[in-house]
Design a protein with these regions (language model features):
Chain B
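Beta-propeller domain segments
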Residues: 32-81, 188, 206-208, 214-217, ...
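Structural WD40 beta-propeller signal
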Residues: 92, 102, 145, 194-196, ...
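Short loop/turn segments immediately following the C-termini of beta-strands
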Residues: 112, 154-156, 162, 204-206, ...
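Asp-box/WD-like beta-propeller blade repeats and closely related beta-sheet repeat scaffolds
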Residues: 129, 138, 143, 155-194, ...
Length: 201, 413
């Protein structure tokens, strides 16, 4: 069943409230979003100037939780998450730079995703979310909290790659939760759930 | 991560399999014989959460993975008893957790979330912090014996020989033991060297509240010379701090109680081990006198050994040490200091202190009081104590995995 406009508005409103609460609630957020915008020029080439990426393998950052962006930048800088594109950029950033950049992108509005039209995998993906307790950490809205990322509306290819990576251990995670959570997923589960998530706002 | 190495594990059940078996038994139905894949279980921290508790928006606090600059650390907020003072002893140690001293005075510091082990060298007026080891799998447990640093990862114990003369080029490790369970949940270790030369550590429950495999929810020990593993005591949900009484040589340890049973229950606890084979009740009985609301049915707390002291609900007691120094006033001698990491499963935060336990001549706790407070300010914490360690000069060191620092609490002058 497709979601109607009312539900979509409700979800968007709830998301905005949650985002505000998260930003105000964390000590990291003595951060300066305006400074973050200036510092994010190098990021824009791949992630989009407003954090909405058009590259299927590069994640959108708009509306992402600030603590997730900050933690991942730290992980890239410390070589605990390695990516040949990201690592050189992160290597140059201070903690304060990272917090500013995180504050900027988390405050940007996520673009409307291209919804799948009657794709039968949509319902299957929804069932994967329910059956694997994704909402326990990512929240029922799948918009994330604190260092747990928003996964709603991320790119399909990026999600598939990350989930496969969590399952094999290629994508490290800070506390091991995703490595554990990805183990029961079949590759069909991974593609189904990625499709579902990519269509969520 | 739901796999086990079975060198010593005779009855190995994955948590998922255990949960499945339990669910099957409770429903009076046969366990499905060939599931396509192990069923997914909620993340550890959410196990046992009741539907009505979801709206509380409680979840574990984000781990500390960076370090504050020394001038950013608000130590003026810390309150101590009269005559004591606190200072930053070392900074720039992201996720600083368990501490152990080398024979020549090097302080080794493990981590849970960043994979590093630090070596702190005291240069008199300042400390030099070296990142000694990198890329390890939750190297939270450390011990020092015969010139070697022992590091406990989730499933392995490693040995780095003659470490204090090789701080800038540590040797390749010798694998002392590699057959511990690989569960991430409560899989990181606290480790300490026993007076018998064995390495003591916990194997935590692989979930918040469940019937653990017989290999889990215990304090275990390994003879590092022979690679032999034994269970010391069982029924222990997750201990992240232990020490041996300096006079009686009995093992004492802290334990973290289950979540989602209530704001004020169960208490986290302090335990005294008077003999091998004690069972402290998890998952059936908590805090010595409170049956679990699910697994306690048909059981009695009389079946189990009781803790020495209740420490308060959800306070997360981690590192503990007996105070064996001579710098503090005489009444502190052989007291226990406990680093309380602080609560998450409680709407009003509790813990976030270093506390003090005084024992009487028979080893019974007679006083439990806060010693260093102020990490928590109006429901917001800026730091979290993880471990305490008595320095050679009798000062008390405290590690903080949010500020990424080591503090020194001293007395007098």
């Amino acid at each position: 069943m497709q979601r109607g406009p009312i539900l979509r508005v409700f979800v968007a409103a709830r998301l905005a409230v949650l985002a505000a609460a998260v930003i105000q609630g964390h000590p990291a957020m003595g951060a300066d979003a305006a400074a973050g915008k200036a510092k994010s020029e190098a990021c824009a080439a791949c992630h989009g100037p407003d954090g909405n990426s058009t590259n299927p393998l590069i994640p959108s950052l708009a509306g992402q939780t600030p603590l997730y962006i900050y933690y991942q930048l730290v992980q890239f800088r410390e070589q605990r998450r390695v990516n040949e594109l990201m690592s050189p950029f992160a290597a140059k950033l201070t903690d304060a730079d990272m917090k500013d950049i995180a504050a900027y992108y988390s405050g940007q509005k996520a673009a409307e995703p291209a919804l799948p039209a009657d794709d039968p995998r949509y319902e299957a993906g929804k069932a994967v979310v329910a059956g694997n307790h994704c909402g326990s950490c990512h929240l029922p809205t799948l918009t994330g909290q604190q260092q747990i990322p928003r996964i709603a509306g991320l790119q399909y290819d990026y999600l598939v790659k990350q989930l496969r990576g969590f399952k094999t251990g290629e994508r490290p995670d800070i506390d091991g939760s995703m490595a554990s959570a990805a183990q029961p997923l079949s590759d069909k589960d991974i593609t189904d759930v990625s499709l579902y998530l990519a269509g969520l706002r | 991560m739901l796999t086990f190495t079975s060198r010593w594990c005779v009855v190995c059940l994955t948590p998922a399999a255990a949960a499945l078996a339990l669910a099957g038994a409770m429903a009076q139905q046969p366990v499905p014989t060939a599931p396509a894949a192990a069923p997914a279980v909620p993340p550890t921290w959410a196990q046992g959460r009741k539907p009505e508790q979801e709206s509380l928006n409680l979840a574990p606090h984000p781990p500390g993975i960076t370090a504050l600059a020394p001038e950013e650390i608000p130590l003026d907020r810390i309150k101590l008893p009269e005559g004591f003072r606190i200072a930053v002893w070392a900074s720039g140690l992201p996720n600083a957790r368990s501490m152990t001293f080398g024979r020549n005075g090097t302080l080794f510091v493990g981590t849970r979330f960043v994979g590093s082990v630090y070596a702190v060298v005291d240069k008199g007026t300042a400390r030099e912090v070296k990142t000694l080891l990198k890329g390890l799998h939750r190297p939270n447990g450390l011990a020092f014996k015969n010139g070697a640093l022992y590091v406990a990862e989730v499933s392995r114990i490693l040995r780095y020989d003659s470490i204090e003369s090789r701080l800038d080029s540590p040797p390749e490790p010798v694998v002392v033991f590699d057959a511990l369970p690989k569960d991430e949940a409560h899989g990181w270790k606290f480790m300490t060297l026993g007076p018998d030369g064995w390495l003591y550590f916990q194997i935590g429950s692989p979930g918040n509240i469940l019937i653990p495999p017989v290999t889990h929810a215990q304090i275990a020990r390994v003879d590092p010379e022979r690679g032999v593993l034994e269970t010391v005591v069982s029924g222990v949900r997750n201990s992240v701090g232990m020490d041996f009484h300096p006079v009686t040589r009995e093992l004492w340890f802290t334990n973290n109680g289950r979540d989602w049973m209530g704001e004020d229950v169960p208490n986290d606890t302090l335990h005294r081990v008077t003999h091998k084979g004690m069972n402290f009740g998890f998952p059936f009985c908590h805090q010595g006198d409170l049956l679990d609301d699910e697994f306690g049915k048909g059981r009695s707390c009389q079946e189990f050994d009781a803790p020495a002291l209740k420490l308060g609900p959800h306070v997360a007691p981690l590192g503990m040490r007996f105070y064996t120094g001579r710098q503090f006033p005489a009444e502190y001698r052989n007291n226990i200091f406990i680093a309380e990491h602080g609560s998450w499963n409680r709407t009003r935060k509790q813990g976030f202190n270093v506390s003090r336990v005084v024992l009487d001549g028979d080893g019974r706790p007679v006083k439990y009081e806060p010693f260093a407070t102020g990490f928590l300010q109006a429901e917001t914490f800026w730091g979290r104590p993880v471990d305490v360690q008595v320095a050679p000069d009798g000062a008390l060191l405290v590690s903080d995995d949010v500020a990424g620092a080591i503090y020194r609490i001293s007395y007098g002058k």
